[in-house]
Design a protein with these regions (language model features):
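Short, intrinsically disordered N-terminal pre-domain segments
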Residues: 1-12, 165
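Terminal beta-strand-rich extracellular "head" domains
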Residues: 20-165
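Extracellular carbohydrate-recognition regions
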Residues: 7-25
């Protein structure tokens, strides 16, 4: 359902798109390579841009990082096509011991056209092929958390109360 509110202040902090993959489903995984790729065609979020034209995209996923660097990015296509190189971030550095953990990461996207529908896919890569495995889901005890991706409306940039830069 598209956003129907019209006042900008009604959007600030509102979740305007949400996807979860792996609730009560067989666990799944994706092994990273040294090139960005969309991790699963369902790993996406769709939303209608708020009046501010600014959103925060959030992702949460479990990973076996095996002492390697991991990078997360956003794509505007189900086959990885970078949204912008400034949205490709290093998110995990080599740990001293086990690298298994949940990574929560956010992007702030500005310059969107209010009222326009957008759809972004989650992409990832590693510095070494086949070294990192992302995992999600489960339908039994002691399995993985679901993959989560959401879009939250951010306020219009005003004075010192919302600064994007």
């Amino acid at each position: 359902m598209p956003n129907t509110l019209t006042k900008a202040e009604n959007f600030d902090g509102r979740i305007i798109g949400y996807t979860t993959v792996g609730i009560d489903a067989a666990d799944d995984s994706f092994t990273l390579t040294d090139s960005f790729a969309v991790t699963d065609s369902a790993h996406k979020v769709k939303f209608v841009a708020p009046p501010s034209g600014v959103v925060e995209i959030f992702v949460s996923v479990y990973g076996d990082f095996l002492r390697r660097f991991a990078y997360f990015g956003l794509s505007d296509n189900a086959t990885y096509n970078t949204l912008d190189v400034t949205h490709e971030h290093i998110v995990a550095q080599p740990p001293t011991a086990s690298g298994d953990r949940v990574i929560n990461h956010q992007w702030v996207i500005t310059g969107l056209t209010a009222g326009t529908a957008y759809e972004y896919w989650f992409g990832a890569k590693s510095t070494h092929s086949l070294a990192i495995v992302l995992r999600w889901g489960g339908n039994a005890t002691e399995e993985y958390a679901p993959f989560i991706m959401k879009a939250t409306a951010l306020p219009t940039a005003v004075a010192d109360f919302a600064v994007y830069g």
